[in-house]
Amino acid sequence: MNFLGFAHWFMSIRISQLKDHSISVDQARYATSIFTKYLDTATVKVSNKFYKTTLSADMVFTKEDVSTSDEQIERLTREYNIHYRACIGSLIYLLSTRVDLSFAVHKLARFSANPGKLHFEGLVHLLR
């Protein structure tokens, strides 16, 4: 078997082999593409404020917050211009290198079948 060299990219994950023989992995390019794809197209008024936390402490998600009909989900998707399930799926793939987001992403992913207005607000907060 021939040595083909060191890997630099694998499935949108950048692999850096440092001089001390350690390996670093990151998905900076993929994360940037997620943020530009979903946040820049969001039609809801988003402030320029950046948050230090992934979810606000006062955001409590319950069964009462879910959408009760498909029409409500479609209206929220049009209002926020974010496809909730696709964005959650992209963020779940990002968790392979950003484990600090896992609690917030999985909390929002629980409601991917019937997201309500509060869930969309939480998703926008996470993307900020």
Name every feature range the model reports, one short phrase each:
Residues 1-128:
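Long, low-complexity, charge-biased intrinsically disordered regions
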